Amino acid sequence: MGGCVGAQHDSSGSLNENSEGTGVALGRNQPLKKEKPKWKSDYPMTDGQLRSKRDEFWDTAPAFEGRKEIWDALKAAAHAFESNDHELAQAIIDGANITLPHGALTECYDELGNRYQLPVYCLAPPINMIEEKSDIETLDIPEPPPNSGYESQLRLRLSTGKDLKLVVRSTDTVYHMKRRLHAAEGVEPASQRWFFSGRPLTDKMRLEELKIPKDYVVQVIMSQPLQNPTPVEN
């Protein structure tokens, strides 16, 4: 993501091939284009899911090769670009000496020749965005009949790093499993986002329909701290 490609600037502002580099011709630096990328997500995405995906990228990007100050500048430029403040985005890019061979933030280089690539989801929302479910809609989910289905243990990995096994029933919806997790860990259902094989699970999906393999770990992203922490003894 931030690997050095062995390129250098010349006096005209272009990027030339380095005789000892990879032989990749990067082309002339271009001003940032105003057109936003249009893309479609693999699954309909809510605003909250998009924010989480972006946060995950910006939290991990500086861990790759490249300079943190450049990542910070690119994050600020991406925010300005999406907010239609094109002049500010260009000023940030120029101030950090960032080169755009194609006039897009999807491929950038710093003055040392390090390459930085921003995913399109950091620059614009997908064309298949959907609205967040409201609390009123959630109330429409019917309760499963008592003791219906069969009982099993579902392995969860929380965003806090904690692993646990949650006792669930095959007729449970994702929302009811969120309520079970709320009872066990104190995290409100609205603050939980469940993912199976990278796919977000909606509240109305039933466990028996998901066909989650035994011992498969379901990821749970939580947007609030755990409630009622265990007191520390003196």
UniProtKB/Swiss-Prot annotation:
Residues 1-46 are annotated as: Disordered. It is found in: Cytoplasm. SUPFAM superfamilies: Ubiquitin-like (SSF54236). Pfam families: UBD, ubiquitin. PANTHER family: UBIQUITIN DOMAIN CONTAINING 1 PROTEIN-RELATED. CDD domains: Ubl_UBTD2 (cd17121). Residues 152-227 form the Ubiquitin-like domain. This is Ubiquitin domain-containing protein 2. One of its GO terms (cellular component) is cytoplasm. It comes from Bos taurus. It comes from the Eukaryota. Signal peptide: none annotated. PROSITE patterns: UBIQUITIN_2. Keywords: Cytoplasm. Residues 9-21 have a biased composition (Polar residues). Residues 32-41 have a biased composition (Basic and acidic residues).
